Amino acid sequence: MNLKLGIVGWPLTKTYSPLIHKLLGEFLGINLEYQKVPIENLDRQKIQDINSKFDGYNITVPHKNKIIELIENTDGYLPDHHVKELGICNTIKLVDNNIYAFNTDIEGINKTLESIYTKINNKNILILGSGGSSKTIEYLFEEHNTVQIASREPNLDSISYNEINDIAPKIDILINTTPIGMPPFEEESLNIPFNQFNNLEVFFNLGYNVKE
């Protein structure tokens, strides 16, 4: 099997996705080519060009929402139920002129936390950041848990970072979805009162620091 895959996002200066997929292809015995496709401003023409060259691709920041706007009215567009409900997509599969759209973040996050908890119920969860990943996590856990989001621009659905002090002692799971620690924010740190999280069971960082 020969597959040409890629990752679409910006800036993609220090992503490990090509290396990870190279190793995965070797492990599975698949002849797999995986390329970085750095695009700052995504539009329909660029998506058409990508679709003509690849068998599938991942979408990362800042395009997980934008991609849906650009392909949802295209013939052959087939989103999974998570993409339909959330409007957030991180994986495209191209087969026989059909565009299959998936949100695999949901399964990845769920499996990671279920390696710690058998069931994630009745937990107080605080999510740092209010982007696409934050909405995915809220969607995943809000039915059986208390989920709050901290945002630099708080609204009716989120709190400000200054309010974290008030709820920190009650939080069981803290999840960072901000780009802090990732390019180009490697030298920045989360300005939150870690010493106030007296009952914290898990700190889950969705990003990775290249130095680590």
What does each model-found stretch correspond to?
Residues 56-66, 133, 179-182, 208-209:
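Short glycine-rich anion-binding loops that position phosphate/pyrophosphate groups of nucleotides
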Residues 11, 153-155, 209:
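Residues in the short beta-alpha loop(s) of Rossmann-like NAD(P)-binding domains
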Residues 157-212:
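Rossmann-like adenosine-cofactor binding region
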Residues 143-160:
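NAD(P)-binding Rossmann-fold cofactor-contacting core
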Residues 2-115:
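Phosphate/diphosphate ligand-binding glycine-rich loop within oxidoreductases
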Residues 94-95, 144-146, 198-201:
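A short helix->loop->beta-strand "cap" motif at the edges of active sites that frequently abuts
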Residues 9, 101-106, 113-143, 151:
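Glycine-rich adenosine-cofactor-binding loop
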